[in-house]
Amino acid sequence: MRHLRTEAILGGKRCTLHIEDNAKVLLLQPVDGHDREELEQQIKYIEEHTKVPFIHVAIHISKWNDELTPWPAPPVFGKIPFGEGAHDTLLYIREQLLAELYAQFCLTENDVTVFLGGYSLAGLFSLWVAYQPLSPFDGIVAASPSAWYTGWLAYAESHIPQVTHAYLSLGDKEEKTKTKIMSTISKDILQQEELLKQRNINCKMEWNEGNHFQDNGIRTAKGFIWLINNAL
């Protein structure tokens, strides 16, 4: 690997960074424990498919069902409901994390292109961020995003995207689930793709083999590679 891995506390949150010199791209990704296990494979995959120097920042999320969702919703698994912490997470990225990264690596907004990506609920967070004013991102990756989330598609239909590039993906067996709300995910992701294209967003939709609980890292890596190749 050409990247150096390091751990840091940035703006009060623990982050895992993969760094190389002369970076032209910042890749930001909220992660859980499983995502962190796949980081090495993910970074290696991106390295193998682009020569563009980049820095990847994995933001450790401790309350997965709260910090990534924009409004409350009933629980799907177990008894923990979804919260509305996405606003605070975006504020942290925009006002603290990016400022510390620019200072640490002697960068300015004009030096690098910033992409946001994530898997599952982090993919939903990326989609939601794509619709927020003053978004600091040039493109987003929503890999197997939770587009089934209560109220999401109505929100996407009634708001204007603020990014110019978006990558979506889904496993071809993800709709085969006993969880009713998630069984519509194939239809939901295609509706999301159509909504973005109606707004003239450069949108890529990719189908992967398998269900939801596999290949998180590679699936997310594919999205970042597409952005690097199409949005710089």
Locate each region found by the language model.
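A domain-start/cap signature at the N-terminus of enzymes
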Residues: 1-25, 54-55
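Serine-hydrolase catalytic machinery in alpha/beta-hydrolase-like enzymes
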Residues: 21-107
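Short beta-strand immediately N-terminal to the catalytic nucleophile in serine-hydrolase-like folds
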Residues: 113-118, 143
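Gly/Ala-rich beta-loop-alpha elbow adjacent to hydrolase catalytic centers
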Residues: 117-122, 126
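Short, hydrophobic alpha-helix immediately C-terminal to the catalytic nucleophile
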Residues: 127-131, 221
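A conserved short beta-strand
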Residues: 135-147, 165
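The feature captures the conserved acid-bearing segment of alpha/beta-hydrolase catalytic domains
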Residues: 148-219, 225-227
